[in-house]
A protein has these predicted regions:
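Extracellular polysaccharide-degrading/modifying enzymes targeting complex plant/algal/animal polysaccharides
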Residues: 1-183, 188, 193-195, 201-203, ...
Length: 231
């Protein structure tokens, strides 16, 4: 429900940063596949209508050396590195351009088992036992985000908020975030620690416009000036 001007609805952690809103779930039941590589399976029913492990990050002006999924795998609170093939999980290589090159050896890969309707995750934990570590997978698209527009005058105060499978949010698209008002007004987001969103942590961006949603990517749209140049 929305608040009113001068009458905010307040969500506040009793202890500053003591409460944690997360879009992740524990990843359990790992079995050893090969060397340092383990595998686990997640029923697709867990994800409802949005499976982060079949959804690729995409949108206008998104350019990357590799197109990743919106889902992620976390080891002790830190996101591991998705790779394109199972072979890259079995024999990972250091990515020197990373802020933490050594951690780039902690890789994961996903595929679908259509017969069993399951998401299959392979991960290289570099000798660690994932059944004894804190391993999580992204299960939700957002953490604190109304499903409807115009839910105004909300305060979010003092929470840790992390690990959402957010989509790319260019100005030509529906701009979602891990936290966001979804085209509402009067929101206050304060004293929060926000981390490990796949894309946007906080989005104050626009609503969905069906005929103007990632139009450059979907329809190779060109504005008037570009059309003139082509002519």
């Amino acid at each position: 429900n929305a608040g009113k001007q001068g009458q905010q609805i307040v969500y506040k952690s009793e202890k500053p940063l003591g409460a944690h809103i997360t879009g992740a779930e524990p990843a359990k039941n790992w079995t050893k596949a090969d060397g340092n590589v383990y595998v686990t399976r997640i029923p697709n029913s867990v994800f409802g209508t949005y499976n982060p492990y079949t959804t690729l990050v995409s949108g206008d002006w998104f350019i990357a050396y590799m197109t990743a999924h919106t889902g992620d795998i976390f080891l002790n609170g830190k996101s591991m590195y998705e790779v394109k093939t199972l072979d890259e999980v079995k024999a990972p290589k250091v990515y020197e351009a990373s802020w933490d090159p050594d951690f780039t050896l902690y890789t994961w890969y996903t595929e679908q088992d259509d017969e069993k309707d399951e998401t299959v995750i392979y991960a290289n934990f570099q000798g660690k036992d994932p059944n004894k570590e804190d391993v999580e997978y992204t299960a939700r698209r957002n953490c604190f985000y109304p499903s409807e527009e115009h839910v105004g005058f909300i305060t979010l105060s003092g929470f840790k908020v992390s690990k959402a499978a957010t989509q790319w949010a260019p100005p030509t698209a529906y701009q979602e975030g891990m936290i966001g008002p979804h085209w509402s007004k009067g929101w206050i987001i304060e004293d929060c620690e926000i981390f490990e969103s796949k894309c946007s942590g906080i989005s104050l961006g626009k609503y969905r416009q069906q005929n103007n949603d990632n139009k450059w990517l979907k329809w190779k749209y060109k504005d008037g000036t570009q059309t003139e140049r082509d002519c």
